[in-house]
Design a protein with these regions (language model features):
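A glycine/proline-hinged amphipathic helix-loop "lid/cap" segment
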Residues: 1-75, 227-232, 317-319
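Alpha/beta-hydrolase superfamily serine-hydrolase fold, recognizing
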Residues: 24, 58-319
Length: 319
């Protein structure tokens, strides 16, 4: 049984999604002013949302990418969480996720860095991947952290970016981070999984209405950041479910049972099992896509505690 706070959250986000979907257009249709409006509106939610007590923010630059550093008195300055925000690669920013990462930093006892990576449709792939790699290397080369002090992760499209950044770092032969924590990751941009259907779209209060509009117009959400002529579904640096996760660090996955992207996480879990990659997997009953965005729910607080416990196990013990 989900909490009363979660029940109220679902009601609120149904209204939010209805409002957003009434303005939403598919990647091939959307205009610059609509994109600008969505970005402003979503950023506003993170700015006005609650923050953990004593939250400190600082604007820094990692590998040439503007980044928001977030910490609280509980944050360990030697334990770093490089967190890529979600938003379908078309919206979202450190501002939109400020409330979320404030509580995440506080409860997981980490110092969180949120890159303001380039978005589509203005910036197409591989701009996002380049920024993901640059920010990780910036923590090492510019700030002096060791890879063992760094965890990476993110929600939705940010989870995708964490995965493809990991696979790119592996190809480059760079020392990998200590672990990954993925929140409702968009691991399958092709939308080919079992949960991509009308029933799940009706159950997913956050992105279901948007995806039904995309399907209706025979479009693909990934067109926000990849041009059709550049799509290669066998390229693991675009579509990470085609990748190999042997010799990768431990990976944690959290996903809601009521989200359209449920099969993304389920398939990723099977791949990690296939490749012998240490992992922890949690399905949150009754929860919607990136439920963590609502920090008023006890489910969110417990999810952040799960993340903190997972990261703790894989950071150096003396840091």
């Amino acid at each position: 049984m989900i909490s009363k706070e979660a029940q109220e959250s679902i009601k609120r986000y149904k209204q939010f999604a209805s409002f957003i979907s009434s303005f939403y257009r598919t990647p091939s249709e959307i205009s610059a002013w609509r994109i600008s409006f969505f970005r402003w509106f979503i950023n506003l939610q993170g700015v006005i949302g609650p923050k953990a007590k004593g939250t400190i923010k600082e604007e820094v630059t990692l590998g040439g990418v503007k980044t928001l550093k977030v910490s609280t008195p509980n944050s360990d300055p030697e334990r770093i969480f490089l967190y890529y925000h979600g938003g379908g690669y078309a919206m979202g920013s450190p501002k939109s996720h400020y409330s979320l990462v404030s509580y995440l930093a506080d409860i997981s006892k980490t110092t969180v860095y949120v890159p303001d990576y380039r978005l589509g449709p203005e910036n197409k792939y591989p701009a996002q991947l380049d920024d993901g790699v640059s920010t990780y290397l910036g923590l090492i080369n510019d700030f002096g952290y060791s890879p063992s002090q760094i965890a990476i992760g993110g929600d939705s499209a940010g989870g995708n970016l964490a995965l493809i950044t990991l696979l790119k770092l592996k190809k480059l032969g760079v020392e990998l981070p200590s672990s990954l924590a993925l929140l409702s990751p968009w691991a399958d941009p092709s939308g080919s999984g079992e949960s991509y259907n009308d029933e799940m779209a009706d159950r997913d209060i956050l992105i279901g209405p948007i995806m039904k509009n995309v399907w209706k117009n025979n479009d693909e959400l990934y067109h926000f950041f990849i041009d059709e002529e550049d799509v290669d579904k066998q390229n693991e640096l675009m579509f990470p479910l085609s990748g190999n996760f042997q010799d990768c660090p431990p990976i944690m996955i959290q996903v809601g049972t009521e989200e359209l992207l449920l099969s993304d996480s389920q398939t990723l879990k099977k791949l990690l099992e296939r490749d012998g990659c240490e992992h922890e997997y949690f399905e949150w009953e009754g929860m919607y896509h990136v439920f963590h965005i609502d920090v008023s729910m006890p489910e969110t607080i417990e999810a952040f505690k799960q993340i903190g416990n997972f990261l703790e196990k894989h950071f150096p013990k003396n840091s």
